[in-house]
């Protein structure tokens, strides 16, 4: 059973969740459709140029259809009548040649800046100021056809943040580093060890490696050897240009607690919301938090909202009191 008690108990002990909880409980938490929502890489990635210079990068996909959201009451009604509403909307738009698109932009942070930034660049609960590091437009992603075979092209797809091309690398973000392994591991369990050979997942360029055998293998490299190092010249060799860049490490290794400012960015978001969206935010929080029976949890969460913005906390407290 889903438990508001457990959800808010966890959040009230995790102030780093405040920014995301504010997004989730606002109108932004329920997009009108997949076409009307932004997308983000969330993690920080690393770019390395031909000269070996390192930059940190954040990816942003901004919808070209504009942001549109649903109020919770209407969303509940739609979910009851058609739980596949979002999938149908996307399918029908593409079928009608109203191809949805997103502008891909990046924020680029020089390596030296990352060493002195006030907010840690590798905390997925924080954003990077677009005033200090403005978005640089890269291109456009357009969805221009629907899957012809849903199983082959959707259910068997294996996206992974660990699929890099030379010049793009993982950052020290610990959550990202965990995902680098977890996604591939899940794919091997779900689709198989040779899922990368399926048409939807296979590379567009020639692949040279020593992988052989395994379940569902259909291109096994004939009698080629499957080990390295070896004495043969015509076998795949490591590309020195694709090696991971070096980086500096200093200090003592250990597990450290850190006191981050979890309130400033949540306050900026709260102040950005129009009055109607603030009202929806307060009502959505009160409807959920008001179900909690443990008053200590409610008090602890309201205290966090108050530390974000006194008005925020006061309005949530008043809304819960009115519905009691």
Where are these regions (language model features)?
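Active-site-adjacent core segments of small-molecule enzymes
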Residues: 1-324
